[in-house]
C-alpha cells in the first residue's frame, strides 16, 4: 500500500533540461490507475512529477509501476449518427434500416441492426453503474480494515489477450476504470487484479489476464451528489451474469442466472455482502437456495455493524463486505476482502450449515 500519489505537480521539458509547469493533479491516494488529460498535444523529451503528498502504510514513499502516453484517435466512429449517447446503448428516434446500412463501421452497424430488430442481448452488456465512496474513508474513521472495492460487478468475463470494447456514456467528469480479477490462483489468493482506465466514448482494451470484470467508480467523499450513474456498454467480452438480491429484475431468477453462468466464478450480491465463489460449488452446495444464502451473509454483516453501534449513530459502512474463494491457508480477513479456502465451500455455500 506504499507509494500512492496525492497532490502532484507535472512538468515537461522540450529540450530535456529546462522544465515548465504543465498542470497540478491530485490523484487522491488511489490504489487504482490514474489519468491525466492534456488540453493540447505536448511535444516533450521528458516529463517530471513532483509528488507533494501521498498515502500508504509507510508514508513518505512515491512509487509508479508504469506510466504510458497516448494520443486520441482522430479517425473514430461518430456515435451521434445512430445512437443517443456515447454508450451506443440506444438508437436515436427515427433511425431506419437505411440509415444503418449507410454506416461505414461494421462493428457499430451490427449493433444498430440488432437493436432496431429488438434482438440485441442488452442484459449485463448495458448497465448503469452508481458511484461508491472509497472504502478507505470509513476505514480511517472506524479504525477497521477497509471494506470492498468491487461493489460494481458487470457480469462480463474476459480472456487473456482479448480486445474488449467498452462504450462509456457521460462520466460527469469522474475517473472511471475497470478491474479484471482472476481468482484462479493455485495455492494462492487471486484477489486483486489488473485495472484499466476508461474514457468517455469508445475504449478498446487489450486484456492481459483472464477474469471477471468490475467497474471502479469511486468518490473521495461519502456523499457526492454530482457523481451520477454512468451508463456503460460492454460490446464484447462474454456474458457470465451475476445475482443481486436487491435488484428487482433478479427476483426469482437465482437458478436461471446461476445455470447460465459460463465462467468458473460467479458473483452474488446482497445489501451488505458480496460473494465470489466457484460456480460449481454454488450449484452443488447452494442449489436453489441462493436467496437464503445471501440473506444469511447480509444478516451476519448487518449484525456485526449493529453490534458496533454503527446503525444507532448512522455510521453504517457504505461498501459491502467482500468474500472470495482462495486456495491457500484456511480463512482470513484483511484489507478489502475476507477469504475462504475452497475446502470450506461445502459449509460456506450451504444455507443450512
Go through the PLM ranges and name each one.
Residues 40-42, 53, 170, 219, ...:
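A mature extracytoplasmic/lumenal domain signature
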Residues 78-243:
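Beta-strand-enriched, solvent-exposed domains that form extended recognition/catalytic surfaces
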Residues 255-257, 264-353:
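Catalytic cores of extracellular degradative/oxidative enzymes
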Residues 1-21, 30-79:
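Aromatic, loop-rich ligand-recognition surfaces of beta-strand-rich domains
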Residues 71-91, 323, 347-353:
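Long, contiguous interaction/targeting segments characteristic
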Residues 2-30, 174-196:
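Non-cytosolic beta-sandwich-type ligand-binding/adhesion modules
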Residues 57-79, 219-265:
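Exposed low-complexity, polar/acidic, P/S/T/G-rich flexible segments that act as propeptides
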Residues 4-7, 32, 43-45, 60-66, ...:
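Residues that flank catalytic or metal-binding motifs in active/ligand-binding sites
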Amino acid at each position: 500500500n506504499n507509494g500512492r500519489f496525492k497532490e502532484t505537480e507535472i512538468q515537461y521539458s522540450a529540450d530535456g533540461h529546462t522544465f515548465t509547469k504543465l498542470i497540478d493533479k491530485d490523484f487522491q491516494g488511489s490504489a487504482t490507475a490514474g489519468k491525466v488529460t492534456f488540453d493540447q498535444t505536448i511535444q516533450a523529451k521528458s516529463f517530471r512529477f513532483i509528488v507533494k503528498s501521498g498515502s500508504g502504510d509507510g508514508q513518505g514513499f512515491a512509487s509508479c509501476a508504469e506510466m504510458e502516453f497516448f494520443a486520441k484517435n482522430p479517425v473514430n466512429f461518430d456515435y451521434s449518427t445512430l445512437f443517443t449517447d456515447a454508450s451506443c446503448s440506444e438508437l436515436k428516434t427515427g433511425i431506419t434500416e437505411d440509415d444503418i446500412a449507410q454506416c461505414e463501421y461494421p462493428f457499430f452497424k451490427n449493433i444498430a441492426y440488432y437493436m432496431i430488430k429488438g434482438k440485441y442481448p442488452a442484459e449485463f452488456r448495458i448497465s448503469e453503474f452508481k458511484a461508491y465512496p472509497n472504502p478507505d474513508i470509513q476505514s480511517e474513521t472506524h479504525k477497521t480494515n477497509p471494506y470492498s472495492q468491487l461493489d460494481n460487478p458487470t457480469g462480463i468475463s474476459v480472456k487473456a489477450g482479448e480486445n474488449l470494447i467498452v462504450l462509456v456514456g457521460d462520466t460527469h467528469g469522474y475517473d472511471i476504470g475497470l478491474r479484471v480479477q482472476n481468482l484462479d490462483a493455485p495455492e494462492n489468493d487471486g484477489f486483486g487484479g489488473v485495472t484499466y482506465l476508461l474514457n468517455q466514448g469508445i475504449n478498446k482494451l487489450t486484456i492481459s489476464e483472464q477474469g471477471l470484470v468490475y467497474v471502479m467508480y469511486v468518490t473521495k467523499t461519502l456523499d457526492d451528489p454530482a457523481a451520477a450513474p454512468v451508463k456503460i456498454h460492454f460490446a464484447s467480452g462474454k456474458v457470465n451474469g451475476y445475482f443481486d438480491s436487491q435488484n428487482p429484475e433478479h427476483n426469482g431468477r437465482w437458478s436461471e442466472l446461476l445455470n447460465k453462468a459460463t465462467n468458473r466464478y460467479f458473483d452474488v450480491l446482497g445489501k451488505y455482502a458480496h460473494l465470489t465463489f466457484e460456480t460449481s460449488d454454488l450449484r452443488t452446495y447452494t442449489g436453489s437456495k441462493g436467496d437464503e444464502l445471501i440473506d444469511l451473509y447480509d444478516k451476519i454483516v448487518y449484525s456485526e455493524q449493529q453490534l458496533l453501534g454503527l446503525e444507532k449513530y448512522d455510521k453504517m459502512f457504505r461498501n459491502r463486505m467482500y468474500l472470495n474463494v482462495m486456495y491457500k491457508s484456511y480463512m482470513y480477513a484483511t484489507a478489502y476482502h475476507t477469504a475462504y479456502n475452497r475446502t470450506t465451500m461445502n459449509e460456506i455455500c450451504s444455507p443450512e450449515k
